[in-house]
């Protein structure tokens, strides 16, 4: 048996750092330097010592006998000496003759020459005295009788022992074990199991400047945000340029934008361009169930940052700790408030010339505490929006740079097909296209792979094996044809680029895809056209089959939401007037219960919304009755071909009456796809 005894963490540290340690031994010494290895080794050594102690005690312990057997041995003259300990335990010694003649039970003898004197330890025995028996009187009577017969009497004595060791083991050991376990879990929970990230050692938290750097070249698009943060880079590179004139750069930069737009990547690029350490942490990492843990982590983080200055601290999802204190319904917890207070103190407690820049990201700036946004803290806010067409093309070029592409792949065409896509979504499309090409055994990623990847990302995975009855297929085909025809002939709708009755995703039974126009303002006529197009599927069902199905559930939800927004938010109702009740934009620190309008106004709003939806439904049904032959022909073609692209739609419906599809004339090969799908579910075909 071989044992490895570890003396102390300091000894291991000195050995690991010795020059004799070769490169191959470094992982071993790194493991041995862990405190867990030290404690495990100590526990193994302690268990070994306890095991050896038990074995030794068993080897030297006297043989135990029954009390009745003890009394019989006394009467037979086999007992030489008796010691009564604390009135209960009896330790005795047999006579040598009784042991030699095997009159009594003893432990096995050790190896010894013949005729040797019997070992006294072999003659020892022990038993336990019942409380009711008077052993002393019994031994006196035995000795008196033995004197008359000439037999040797039994020597006996009563003693008292204080078993403080047993008491200590009985009470102290369990108590110490419980306290140790409690302290261990308290420490683990206080650090969240991340002692190596926050606290005395933040090596894993900080990415040093010597590693692989992310630069502005890796961040496609975001031209305006990069210009804003370029000043931070210049400050970290040459701080004296600003300090010599007495100016101070803002120490806090808040990046605001939707998810996936590149906020974290931009912060890393700032650190990479400046060549300084970068600390990235999520706002939720500060939060624990124990009060004071979050504040302690904030202090440790800023202490480490000051030691590594110049550096950048990036807090992702800062709204996790920066929410408004004392919000409606007690929105802030005590721990979060303490953490936020400590963050405010730290941000207000160091000078800008220390070289520590704090960057944070959130997609909920409306819920942040006002003290966090005041001058001197996060006083510079940079908005990061979803990329436009030119920026999307640049992002596609970055993500396809490592792919083996076919000559048919055009980033400009892909950018035109993906309005509203963020950088993370574009990266997902490129990755899906590469996986599809590999699955098909191709040597390069083709444009068709990107087309299929777009369908998969927007509408879900194709479910070609889903069983649909012929009657339901006819309903789905007319439903999607109704969407396409209404959208094709209205002025303010998005161009229809694809119609499909192939089931996709978890619930889509069919879908009509549109290419959204990149615009920010919508008139009342534009919103009415969009609602009319959404009701085209239900209208086709009513006209052809005389009834509506549950397939229009999602369409009705979108229409209802748009109609309420027109009346309540945008003031587009002549009956209600140009009023906005901000129903979708309540402030986080506003009152929890607020009645924005009277019951009479609520009833008027409901009636106006119903009138708007009925108007859109009537427009859709009138247009579909006018185009009934085209509706039936398109549905039949969908039942045969399952998918109709733009070229097939133009051949079937003719040129759009409100202008050609300019992007189709450019010959970019996008007639097979689009960017936005009106998906379907079991209760909504699209």
UniProtKB/Swiss-Prot annotation:
Cofactor (UniProt): Zn(2+)
Disulfide bonds: none
Binding of Zn(2+), residues: 479, 483, 555
Subunit description: Homohexamer.
Family to which this protein belongs: In the central section; belongs to the AAA ATPase family.
One record GO biological process: proteolysis
Organism lineage string: Bacteria, Pseudomonadati, Rhodothermota, Rhodothermia, Rhodothermales
Record region (Disordered): 661-686
Protein EC: 3.4.24.-
Primary localization class, coarse: membrane
Protein name: ATP-dependent zinc metalloprotease FtsH 1
Entries under Pfam families matching the protein: AAA, AAA_lid_3, FtsH_ext, Peptidase_M41
Cofactor binding: number and manner: Binds 1 zinc ion per subunit.
Assigned keywords, A-Z: ATP-binding, Cell inner membrane, Cell membrane, Hydrolase, Membrane, Metal-binding, Metalloprotease, Nucleotide-binding, Protease, Transmembrane, Transmembrane helix, Zinc
Record-level Gene Ontology MF annotations: ATP binding; ATP hydrolysis activity; ATP-dependent peptidase activity; metalloendopeptidase activity; zinc ion binding
Periplasmic-facing ranges: 55-164
Biased composition (Polar residues): 670-686
Protein's organism: Salinibacter ruber (strain M8)
Function: Acts as a processive, ATP-dependent zinc metallopeptidase for both cytoplasmic and membrane proteins. Plays a role in the quality control of integral membrane proteins.
Localization terms from the record: Cell inner membrane
GO annotations of cellular component type: plasma membrane
Segments in the Cytoplasmic topological domain: 1-33, 186-686
Membrane topology note: Multi-pass membrane protein
Alphabetized NCBIfam families for the sequence: FtsH_fam (TIGR01241)
């Amino acid at each position: 048996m071989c044992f490895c005894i570890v003396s102390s963490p300091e000894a291991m540290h000195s050995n690991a750092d010795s020059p004799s340690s070769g490169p191959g031994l470094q992982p071993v010494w790194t493991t041995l330097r862990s405190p867990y290895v030290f404690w495990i080794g100590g526990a193994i050594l302690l268990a070994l010592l306890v095991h050896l102690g038990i074995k030794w005690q068993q080897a030297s312990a006297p043989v135990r006998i029954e009390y009745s057997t003890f009394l019989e041995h006394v009467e037979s003259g086999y007992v030489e000496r008796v010691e009564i300990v604390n009135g209960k335990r009896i330790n005795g010694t047999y006579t040598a003759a009784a042991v030699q003649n095997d009159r009594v039970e003893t432990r096995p003898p050790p190896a010894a020459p013949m005729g040797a004197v019997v070992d006294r330890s072999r003659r020892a025995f022990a038993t336990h005295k019942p409380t009711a028996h008077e052993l002393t009187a019994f031994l006196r009577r035995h000795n008196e009788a033995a004197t008359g017969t000439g037999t040797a009497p039994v020597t006996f004595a009563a003693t008292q022992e204080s078993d403080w060791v047993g008491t200590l083991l009985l009470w102290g050991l369990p108590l110490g074990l419980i306290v140790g376990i409690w302290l261990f879990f308290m420490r683990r929970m206080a650090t969240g199991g991340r002692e190596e990230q926050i606290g005395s050692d933040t090596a894993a938290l900080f990415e040093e400047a010597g590693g692989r750097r992310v630069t502005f070249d890796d961040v496609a698009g975001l031209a305006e945000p990069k210009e804003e943060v370029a000043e931070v880079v210049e400050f970290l590179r040459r701080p004296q340029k600003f300090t010599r004139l007495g100016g101070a750069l803002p120490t806090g930069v808040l990046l605001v934008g939707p998810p996936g737009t590149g906020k974290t990547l931009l912060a890393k690029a700032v650190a990479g361009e400046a060549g300084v350490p970068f600390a990235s942490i999520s706002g939720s990492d500060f939060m624990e169930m124990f009060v004071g843990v979050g504040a302690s982590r904030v202090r440790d983080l800023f202490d480490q940052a000051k030691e590594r200055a110049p550096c950048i601290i990036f807090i992702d999802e800062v709204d996790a700790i920066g929410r408004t204190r004392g919000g409606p319904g007690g929105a802030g917890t005590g721990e979060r408030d303490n953490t936020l207070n400590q963050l405010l103190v730290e941000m207000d407690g160091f000078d800008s010339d220390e070289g520590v820049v704090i960057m944070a990201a959130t997609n909920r700036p409306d819920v942040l505490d006002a003290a966090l946004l005041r001058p001197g803290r996060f006083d510079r806010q940079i908005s990061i929006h979803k990329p436009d067409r030119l920026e999307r093309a640049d992002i596609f070029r970055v993500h396809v740079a490592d792919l083996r592409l076919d000559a048919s792949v055009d980033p400009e065409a892909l950018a035109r097909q993906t309005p509203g896509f963020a950088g993370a979504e574009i990266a997902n499309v490129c990755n899906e296209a590469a996986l599809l090409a590999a699955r098909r055994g191709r040597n390069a990623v083709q444009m068709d792979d990107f087309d299929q990847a777009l369908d998969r990302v927007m509408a879900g995975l194709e479910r070609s094996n889903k069983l649909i009855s012929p009657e339901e297929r006819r309903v789905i085909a007319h439903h999607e044809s109704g969407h396409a025809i209404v959208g094709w002939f209205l002025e303010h709708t998005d161009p229809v680029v694809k119609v499909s009755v192939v089931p996709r995703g978890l619930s889509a039974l069919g879908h009509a895809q549109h290419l959204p126009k990149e615009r920010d303002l919508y008139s009342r006529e534009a919103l009415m056209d969009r609602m009319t197009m959404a009701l085209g599927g239900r209208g086709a069902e009513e006209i052809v089959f005389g009834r509506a199905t549950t397939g229009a559930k999602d369409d009705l939800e979108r229409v209802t939401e748009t109609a309420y927004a027109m009346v309540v938010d945008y003031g587009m109702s002549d009956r209600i007037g140009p009023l906005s009740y901000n129903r979708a934009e309540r402030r986080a620190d506003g009152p929890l219960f607020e009645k924005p309008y009277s019951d009479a106004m609520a009833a008027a709003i409901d009636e106006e919304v119903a009138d708007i939806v009925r108007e859109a439904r009537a427009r859709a049904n009138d247009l579909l009755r006018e185009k009934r032959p085209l509706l039936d022909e398109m549905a039949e073609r969908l039942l045969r071909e399952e998918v109709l692209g733009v070229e097939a739609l133009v051949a079937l419906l003719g040129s759009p009456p409100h202008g050609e599809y300019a992007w189709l004339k450019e010959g970019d090969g996008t007639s097979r796809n689009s960017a936005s799908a009106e998906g379907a579910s079991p209760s909504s075909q699209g």
